[in-house]
């Protein structure tokens, strides 16, 4: 029988439509046509992007030239522009302000063909460190209230360029979905004097059936009330409110579980398009860090949001998270295939501190 499940953080209900239950092989494969031709993110084309605002490059090389490992530039076609004042104002009953913000692109690797999960853990750590540096810098601007970090992988997920990249957008408001999540966390904390994400980590670790993988610092799970098939959350086990406050050792552990989670998704689902979104605390006037807990949400693009979802806000998910977690645990990232590897629920294949071969 179908179930309605309530997300314990924001109170959102979803329908787990077991009558439509799907395993990975039941989903139609979304294949993005390979584009050929010029790529502005490839080494040698640095002059075709705005100047770099952050870079990890070989010592002695000049800015905006090749021989870099990670590169961050302003988006050539920004959603928000960094120049100007907010000029908040009313138009009758309506509110508006100038579209002030920042929009940056983090190029993950010089290699055009390498997807995020194929990067060595050390390279993913460089990417996460670059995210941290740029978020700290952008948060110094008093006009900005929130910094959204996200990745669109594949044309169906909104990617317009194939070369691996992450985007950062600083906004002058705290987006509604973030406010809903913060309010849900605060309500739980005021009621129980505990962080709800810490409670989720403790409960999921104890029952194990929705765990995808883990290490000493992070837990990767299929959430109890997922909006989408194989929606995956990566959550710090210790209470951490703000991503940009994370030390290098925590980021290294995060890199390992991120990589393994995406490897399992790619192997189980035949490399689907996906989005991942970083949820972290707002910047500037945000003071209370006791109740909010940063995390990453990964959403493979396997189904489409249609009229019922738009009209009601209820999502229909044909794959129970327990079945999704079990299937993701069956694949074997170490051997690069989808055969079961006998890994116990929640047991990582290898310590995250081990570096993969170059």
Where would I find each of the regions flagged by the language model?
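HIT superfamily nucleotide-processing domains
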Residues: 1-358
């Amino acid at each position: 029988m179908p179930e309605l499940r309530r997300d314990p953080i924001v109170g959102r209900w979803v329908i787990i439509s077991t009558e439509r239950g799907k395993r990975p092989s039941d989903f139609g494969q979304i294949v993005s046509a390979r584009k050929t031709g010029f790529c502005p993110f490839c080494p040698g084309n640095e002059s075709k992007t705005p100047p770099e605002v952050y870079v990890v490059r070989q010592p002695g090389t000049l800015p905006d030239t090749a021989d870099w490992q990670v590169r961050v530039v302003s988006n050539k076609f920004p959603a928000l522009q960094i120049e100007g004042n907010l000029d908040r104002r009313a138009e009758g009953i309506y509110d508006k302000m100038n579209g002030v913000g920042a929009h940056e692109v983090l190029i993950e690797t010089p290699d055009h063909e390498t997807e995020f999960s194929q990067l060595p853990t050390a390279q993913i750590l460089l990417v996460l460190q670059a995210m941290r540096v740029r978020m700290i810098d952008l948060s110094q601007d008093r006009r900005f209230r929130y910094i959204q970090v996200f990745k669109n992988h594949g044309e169906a997920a909104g990617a317009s360029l194939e070369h691996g990249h992450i985007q950062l957008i600083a906004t002058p408001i705290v987006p509604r979905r973030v406010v809903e999540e913060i309010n849900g966390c605060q309500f739980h904390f005021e009621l129980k004097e505990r962080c709800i994400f810490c409670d989720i980590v403790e409960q999921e670790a104890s029952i194990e059936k929705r765990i995808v993988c883990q290490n000493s610092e992070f837990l990767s799970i299929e959430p109890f009330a997922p909006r989408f098939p194989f929606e995956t959350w990566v959550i710090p086990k210790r209470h951490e409110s703000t991503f940009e406050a994370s030390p290098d050792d925590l980021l290294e552990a995060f890199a390992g579980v991120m990589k393994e989670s995406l490897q399992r998704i790619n192997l189980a689902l035949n490399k689907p398009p996906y989005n991942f979104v970083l949820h972290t605390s707002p910047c500037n006037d945000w003071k209370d860090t006791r109740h909010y807990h940063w995390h990453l949400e990964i959403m493979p693009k396997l189904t489409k949001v249609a009229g019922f979802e738009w009209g009601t806000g209820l999502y229909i998910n044909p794959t129970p998270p327990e079945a999704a977690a079990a299937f993701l645990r069956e694949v074997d990232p170490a051997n690069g295939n989808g055969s079961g590897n006998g890994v116990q629920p929640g047991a990582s294949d290898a310590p995250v501190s081990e570096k993969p071969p170059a």
